A protein has these predicted regions:
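Short, surface-exposed beta-strand/loop micro-motifs that present aromatic residues
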Residues: 1-5, 114, 210-215, 263-270, ...
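Carboxylate/His-rich catalytic cores and anion/metal-binding grooves
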Residues: 161-173
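Alpha-helical secondary-structure segments
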Residues: 139-143, 161, 295
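Active-site recognition of the HExxH zinc-binding catalytic motif
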Residues: 29-41, 300
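M16 family metallopeptidases and their MPP-like homologs
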Residues: 3, 8-24, 30-31, 48-143, ...
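Non-catalytic, conformational "gating/processing" segments within enzyme and secreted inhibitor domains
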Residues: 154-158, 172, 176, 206-242, ...
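Proteolytic maturation boundary segments
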Residues: 2, 231-271, 276-277, 281, ...
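Peptidyl-prolyl cis-trans isomerase
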Residues: 41, 45, 94-101, 108, ...
Length: 491
């Protein structure tokens, strides 16, 4: 996916993988997220002082993790015995590791915003590079994804454990996960969180991570999304030069776990120190369906930050605090989420009734005729603003690829939305929002006595080589690039 945009001598680079937490094995949730972290650790070519000496130690560590996860959680003696071996050998292996070589190399290219993220159906690796560094960046990324080496793994566990513990303490995260669990009692959207379950986090498998990488990180399941100042023909040749030898494998398959219709209200309570709040959600069909398009319009009728029914009738009238709604369009299913907080003296149940009352207004058509046209104008303006930045354009590419929507259809989305009438929205609301087909999560203020914690095992601090450099880094840094020619404004 390429779009040339000569706004500045920069290029936004997003490498997207059509795989996320929904693709995790049932017995190893959190795996996609672990892998994202490990893709910053290097390969057999960089990130190591001597890979031939490092590899036998890494192989031992991988085998020990398999032994560790096979031991019952209650067998603390044997688990501690094996963990002590993992910790000890990891310290030896770390003596060969060169820390942060990937970050050093992209920084040397002049990259900004280096990052990555994992969600339920995608993993995306991000950089913003100078336009004269495209070839070096392509060379580096091709090497990065050729054969990643999962070194310094047990210290990375500590980072992931801390992420999990923060999530367990976060009221918003608890509400969100409870909402997904209620809406998707079968599908992985609700049953496999991105971070993973505590038992699986405590029993990680490097072997399973490698299997996941080999299955999903293949050229026919990945997309290079570039937006910026570059020449199309030259860039395509460079992509072919550095990525052309990647082996195409069988297209990964995913079996969608079908959900039965929701026929009675699903209520859940979560507890925490923050102010009371609620989430409410309805389930719909997935991306690139008529559901997803009319859902987008219905959501804007209800809440658009200024003239939606919730905005006018509830927020501006001070009937509740911070009410609103949002659509979440995913590949297999979508959801329409609602939220709000009570004002003093008000209950969460009253907040729920107020939000539902605005859905009833949509069903009755009690919104102005001009609102539908105004929503289209607002969506068009948002789209124009998004496409004015390289990051916005690259993100559009990612969305189309992940949702498996042909680019021409993705670009035609606004034209399809324009066809939707007020009556379509009224009919949609009456057909899909009833008094018994939603999930509601009440966030109560109080101590959450059910919060578990991920207890961190003993991890001995490791000594890594921070100043050393691999031959690959030295070679890459010595490669010359053309200087960027300044462009002066002509007044």
């Amino acid at each position: 996916y390429l779009t040339s945009y000569a706004d500045a001598p920069r290029v936004q680079t997003n490498i997207a993988v059509r795989a996320g937490s929904k693709n995790d094995p049932e017995n190893a949730t959190g795996l996609a997220h672990y892998l994202e972290h490990m893709l910053f650790k290097g390969t057999d070519v960089y990130g190591s002082l001597d890979y031939e000496k490092e590899k036998p130690l890494l192989d031992k560590i991988e085998n020990l993790y398999e032994e560790y996860r096979s031991i019952e959680m209650t067998d603390t003696i044997n688990r501690e015995r094996v963990w002590a071996q993992i910790d000890s050998i990891s310290g030896e292996a770390a003596k060969f590791a060169i820390a942060n070589e990937y970050d050093k190399m992209v920084t040397g290219l002049g990259a900004k915003g280096t990052n990555a993220y994992t969600s339920n159906e995608k993993t995306v690796y991000i950089n913003d590079i100078p336009s004269n560094q495209i070839e070096k960046w392509l060379k580096l990324e091709a090497e990065r994804f050729r054969y990643p080496v999962f070194r310094l793994f047990h210290t990375e566990l500590e980072t992931v454990y801390e992420e999990k513990n923060r999530g367990l303490d976060n009221d918003g995260r608890k509400m969100y996960e409870a909402l997904l669990d209620g809406l998707f009692p079968n599908h992985q959207y609700g049953q496999q969180t991105t971070i993973g379950t505590i038992p699986h986090l405590k029993n990680p498998s490097l072997t399973e991570i490698r299997k996941y990488f080999n299955k999903y990180y293949v050229p026919n399941n990945m997309a290079i999304c570039l937006s910026g100042d570059f020449d199309y023909d030259e860039t395509i040749k460079l992509i072919e030069k550095y990525w052309g030898e990647f082996e195409i494998k069988d297209q990964p398959t995913f079996e969608v776990r079908k959900e039965s219709p929701i026929t009675e209200v699903v209520e859940t309570e979560v507890w925490g120190p923050e102010a009371e709040r609620l989430y409410m959600g309805f389930r719909f069909n997935g991306a690139n369906t008529e559901d997803s398009r009319i859902l987008t319009m219905t959501d804007m009728v209800l809440s658009n930050s200024s003239a939606g029914l919730i905005d006018l009738n509830l927020n501006q009238s001070q009937e509740l605090i911070g009410g609103g709604c949002f659509p979440m369009i995913m590949k297999d299913y979508s959801l329409h989420g609602f939220y709000g907080s009570p004002k003093p003296g008000q209950t969460l149940e009253e907040v729920k009734d107020l939000l539902l009352s605005q859905i009833e207004e949509v069903k009755k058509g009690n919104f102005p005729d001009w609102l539908v046209g105004a929503i289209i104008s607002d969506l068009k303006l948002s789209q124009i603003k998004k496409m004015e930045s390289n990051s916005g354009r690259a993100n559009e590419f990612v969305d189309a690829f992940i949702l498996d929507i042909p680019w021409n259809e993705h670009q035609n989305e606004m034209a399809e939305l324009e066809k939707i009438t007020k009556q379509d929205i009224i009919d949609f609301a009456n057909e899909n929002y009833s008094d018994n087909n939603y999930v509601i999560v009440y966030k109560r203020t109080g101590e959450d006595t059910s919060i578990p914690k991920v207890e961190k095992p003993i991890i001995t601090p490791v000594s890594v080589n921070r100043e050393d450099q691999s031959d690959f880094l030295v070679s890459l840094s010595e490669e010359k690039v053309k200087d960027i020619e300044p462009v002066f404004l002509n007044f």
